[in-house]
Amino acid sequence: MRRILLLFILLFLCERRCITCVFFLNFVRMKLIADSGSTKTDWALVDDCNHSTLLKTQGLNPFHQSEEEMFRVFHDELLPQLCGNIREVFYYGSGVRDDQKAKMECLLRKVVPGLETIEVNGDLLGAARALCGRNEGIACILGTGANSCLFDGQRIIRNTPPLGYILGDEGSGAVLGIRFVNALYKGILSDTIRQDFEWSTGLSLSAIIERVYRQPLANRFLASLSVHIHRYLDDSKVRVMLTDHFRQFFIRNIAPYHRTDLPVSAVGSIAFYYQEQLQDAAKQEGYALGKIERSPLHALIEYHRSV
């Protein structure tokens, strides 16, 4: 009962940032957990009672953004939403390479001073921890892009390079969008599907070519087309296309691990919305699926609660 009362007081104070509130909140220890992509970042503020408050900011990617741009996001968007005595930060993000971890840690310490623990890792380790916990397994990201790894329960021990949507990225939303457009305009799919797609999206072949070849972020545009495929799952050719798309992912990205004994788990919108076809592809290639999650954040909250 006392914990419930403390929780309600905490929620009330988070909304009213007065001097008394700040004094009280300094006694509440918090963890801050982030799952960051290039377009948005999902944050979870977790208190001692294991209550989570979910926050959002725009995306962060140290590969594409300057320190000044990222600090502005931290300072202007994240900081006003924070409350409590944050002692630990666990950040998982796209574009985080080993040579950029120190830069991200420094920026976070400027925004959240006095941290006892700070971890900055790539999104693939975040996916592995969310999907496998502390167990051995194969973890995958199937969203706009695709990635995978062999995880030993503590660290990533192997990674097949995805190579991006031009050279690879089998299983991704971007490559699925390419295959869908190809099938629409080369007569593999019916005129009925093509006409319905053009009517519902307002896109023509010339408009698609303009977006892909003459405008930036073609991968995101192509991935956005993949969501429309869900409307045509009653068509056998669409289902075959999807299953083959995922089979290529297993053949080119998962087979090099030589671990058919391990479950293959995946996070991301493509894995989540096309689970049935992903399951069919896994079965055909001799793999068993494990967990499928749309987002890793809630599983990461559970992972760090038990640390």
Protein language model features and the residues they cover:
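Phosphate-binding/catalytic loop of phosphoryl-transfer enzymes
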Residues: 97-189
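ATP-binding/phosphotransfer module of carbohydrate and carboxylate kinases, centering on a glycine-rich
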Residues: 25-88, 131-138, 181-307
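Cysteine-centered motifs
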Residues: 14, 18-21
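Polybasic, low-complexity association/targeting segments
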Residues: 90-97
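Cofactor-binding loop segments of dinucleotide-utilizing enzymes, especially the Rossmann-like FAD-
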Residues: 94, 123, 269
